[in-house]
Curated annotation (Swiss-Prot):
Coiled-coil regions listed in the entry: none
Family under the similarity heading: Belongs to the complex I subunit 4L family.
Membrane-related topology note: Multi-pass membrane protein
Record-given protein name: NADH-ubiquinone oxidoreductase chain 4L
Entry's Gene Ontology molecular function annotations: NADH dehydrogenase (ubiquinone) activity
Localization terms from the record: Mitochondrion inner membrane
Class of the enzyme per the UniProt entry, highest EC level: translocase
UniProt keyword annotations, A-Z: Electron transport, Membrane, Mitochondrion, Mitochondrion inner membrane, NAD, Respiratory chain, Translocase, Transmembrane, Transmembrane helix, Transport, Ubiquinone
Residue spans crossing the bilayer: 1-21, 29-49, 61-81
Gene Ontology CC, one term: respiratory chain complex I
Protein EC: 7.1.1.2
Disulfide bond sites: none
Primary location recorded for the protein, binned into one broad class: mitochondrion
């Protein structure tokens, strides 16, 4: 494993650990999820470029589309929770009416 792959994998693990440790606030959870998606995007792009696998060159762009959708939904949920309850605690998500 080259140093580039190790650093990208370390960034993913650090984002995952941040998600597991700092999950009390919704904003910190969303930031950690974005870090995970960014490291996955970079890993996929570097792998495709190193292997000259041009058939899968659309895959990182599709991942970015899903990351943008995830960010938009997460921010809309954050705005709804903070307007309703005044805080961005994840425990307030259990109180939302369906």
């Amino acid at each position: 494993m080259s140093m580039v792959y190790a650093n990208i994998f370390l960034a993913f693990i650090m984002s995952l650990m941040g998600l597991l440790m700092y999950r009390s606030h919704l904003m910190s959870s969303l930031l950690c999820l974005e870090g995970m998606m960014l490291s996955l995007f970079v890993m996929m792009t570097v792998t495709i470029l190193n292997n000259h696998f041009t058939l899968a060159s659309m895959t990182p762009i599709i991942l970015l589309v899903f990351a943008a959708c995830e960010a938009a939904l997460g921010l809309s949920l954050l705005v709804m929770v903070s307007n309703t309850y005044g805080t961005d605690y994840v425990q307030n998500l259990n109180l939302l009416p369906c």
